[in-house]
């Protein structure tokens, strides 16, 4: 069957990495995805639209699946983060970032890292509630609610169960913000009682930072609030080679948006130099979400073979290839994977045998 997927190419290097991702996904699915491109971010603003046009939101709500490249957020005003607006508009309450040491990635500082970071995505300091109290004094509010905390904990424990995880680490700073963080922890403890087969630990944020620097392999799944999750997920990406090899996903009720978590890199935009691996691995998550496990396995195998070969990598991965050359090399690896699976000479992938009866995740 075919799937309709909203595609937000993004800003800066976004269109280049999105093009590479589409080529790879079309290969492993046999072209069974109908891509519906829409604009957002500075690309939309340049066209006289809002940073997050209604057309983009309507498309995602209709298709219930989207994947996006990086979107620009002005640092000194202009408009609010489109990423935050997107999450809040669609109630994408759970951000999930798998962080793994990939075979052949020589830039990874640690081997054997395999952890899932789950981040509450809708409140905390990202609620956008700040104001100037008096001249020279600004107040920002950290909003934490029982409903949102329960929801992310239920999601995290269920995600751990369905993905074969054994240990959850609930991250907090209750010694400094006791009311908000203890509410978060109370919801975790309530949920923990329903999942006695998990090992659960409660770890202060500063302890986590130290432990990640010394032995990140001891962690299986990390669950935390919005700001903490944003910072720690980027830190963890640095442990395994950087944001260019780490995928991202945002989940809501019956809706999901997959994304590269790196920036727009305007200094190399339009120069065919960008690394598309992060967005391609995000597409792997997307394929698993819709039940296309065989296509997802095919895509991951191709990426891992590409990294192990080490011949056609972009500069941030230690090579000299451009985006197009990396993508061509990846398609060759995907072709080889398909040939080995069939026990014959390499040939184009036919798409997975598993079919989902409808477009419902």
Where are these regions (language model features)?
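Extreme N-terminal starter segment of soluble prokaryotic enzymes
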Residues: 1-5
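Glycine-rich phosphate/diphosphate-binding loop of Rossmann-like nucleotide-binding domains
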Residues: 6-28, 134-206, 218
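Buried hydrophobic positions in well-ordered alpha/beta secondary-structure cores of metabolic enzymes
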Residues: 11-14, 64, 118, 156, ...
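Buried hydrophobic packing segments
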Residues: 21, 25, 188, 279-287, ...
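N-terminal beta-loop-helix "entrance" segment that forms/cooperates
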Residues: 32-55, 210-212
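Glycine-rich phosphate/nucleotide-binding loop
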Residues: 42-45, 211-314
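N-terminal glycine-rich phosphate/adenylate-binding segment common to multiple enzyme folds
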Residues: 45-139, 227
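Glycine-rich phosphate/pyrophosphate-binding loop and the adjoining helix
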Residues: 128-133, 137-170, 174-177, 195, ...
